[in-house]
Regions:
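Long, low-complexity, intrinsically disordered N-terminal extensions of eukaryotic proteins, enriched
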Residues: 1-34, 42-51, 249-284, 293-299, ...
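N-terminal regions immediately upstream of nucleotidyltransferase
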Residues: 1-91, 95-105, 116-137, 321-324
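Catalytic cores of NTP-dependent nucleotidyl/adenyl transfer enzymes across multiple folds
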Residues: 67, 71-74, 140-291, 295-309, ...
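Residue-level recognition of the N-termini of beta-strands and the immediately preceding loop/turn
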Residues: 86-89, 173, 187, 313-316
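Histidine-centered divalent-metal-coordination microenvironment in nucleic-acid enzymes
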Residues: 89, 95-115, 176-190
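Internal, well-ordered alpha/beta segment that forms a basic, Gly-enriched binding/recognition surface
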Residues: 110-118, 124, 141-151
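Histidine-centered catalytic/metal-binding microenvironments
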Residues: 306-352
Length: 352
């Protein structure tokens, strides 16, 4: 293995047990934003009617139509001898796989994962010792060479089978496929390596590791993700909140489009961030005996309160995977952006 690198990221918990305040404080300095909360664009009954629709996942028929695109793309790539010889595996991922996608937004992701390892060492881990313990070795090829070959093969195979006009390979990370007959939406194909994150568990004296994926962008930057842990923790949260977690995620994602239509916001925040902000909220807030309007508002208020704690140690709050810090230095968003979005959503709901 070449270019072993020492990572600075840590292992984090699930963000539970955060103390709740007993009175309302202006944590964010956005007090003036809430002065206009006396009015809402809808009545409570209208909000509840919309939330009843927005919380639903797509129908079985819609699911089949969406998944057809991914199945076609995967079938094309699985038949490629070059990819087979590299030992890649094909794994679905993204909001559709997590069951947090909203209806009429049908994009679906397919991960093409190479077995070559990208090693990240947590602070305090001796790379040479850890690599020796796990038997890691250099394969003689660079990440750039393999990533370039894999991406070129994927793009060429898809263009040959589906037509050049249906393939957009200009993205930094993903190759986008559109126009699959009989399918709805588009398919994003992401090629990546297998990630091993090496760390020493608290109180232990030997190494442990977590597996994820490492994406090498066209600009040479690395993106490290943990999709399997994300799926597992999301499913657990769904169970412990009596199915309310994913319903509220869908509602808030749809609310973002509604907020743009009403001029409350002019730009979107990533759907992934929305999902993580809802995940931070303790389970009992999802299962109160109240209508949908109050439940959504309760969860949004609590999420804003959580990320607005005085002297906040932002590294305490992880993504849903429980590993990466939600507000790490390399994220595409900031805690200020999260404040702004949550406050805007609460403002949009108004007082009914």
């Amino acid at each position: 293995m070449s270019d072993f690198s020492k990572g600075s990221g840590g292992i984090f918990g699930l963000g539970l047990g955060i103390p709740q305040t007993e009175k309302t404080n202006d944590f964010t300095g956005l007090g003036s934003l809430f002065e206009s909360l006396s009015e809402s664009v809808r009545r409570r009954s209208s909000w509840n009617d919309r939330f009843t629709h927005w919380e639903k996942a797509e129908s079985t028929t819609e699911t089949i139509a969406i998944e057809r695109g991914r199945s076609v793309v995967q079938g094309i790539l699985e038949a490629n001898q070059g990819l087979r010889s590299e030992g890649v595996r094909f794994v679905p991922q993204g909001s559709f796989t997590n069951r947090t996608n909203v209806r009429n937004e049908a994009d679906i992701d397919l991960r093409v994962q190479h077995p070559l390892l990208r090693i990240e060492h947590e602070a305090g881990v001796d790379p040479a010792s850890a690599n020796n313990a796990y038997g890691y070795y250099d394969v003689g090829r660079t990440y750039t060479q393999i990533a370039g070959d894999m991406r070129a093969t994927i793009a060429a195979e898809l263009k040959s089978s589906l037509g050049k006009s249906n393939i957009d390979d200009s993205g930094k990370k993903a190759i986008r496929v559109k126009g699959v007959a009989g399918s709805r939406g588009e398919v994003d194909v992401v090629s990546c390596f297998t990630l091993h994150h090496i760390f020493i568990p608290q109180g232990a004296y030997q190494y442990d590791r977590i597996e994820g994926v490492a994406i090498l962008g066209l600009d040479g930057s690395w993106t490290l993700n943990y999709p399997d842990q994300h799926i597992a923790n999301g499913r657990l949260k769904r169970t412990t909140t009596n199915h309310q977690f994913k319903r509220i995620v869908r509602i808030v994602k749809r609310m973002q489009s509604d907020m743009i239509e009403h001029g409350v916001i002019t730009e979107r925040v990533p759907s992934f961030l929305v999902e993580c902000l809802i995940y931070l909220v303790e389970d009992h807030h999802f299962v109160m005996n109240e209508d949908r309007y109050d439940r959504v508002k309760r969860v949004l208020n609590r999420s804003l309160e959580i990320i607005s704690q005085p002297r906040l140690n932002l590294n305490y709050y992880p993504e849903i995977n429980g590993i990466k810090p939600l507000f790490g230095v390399k994220q595409a968003w900031t805690v200020e952006k999260a404040h702004w979005f949550l406050a805007s959503a609460i403002r949009h709901l108004g007082e009914c």
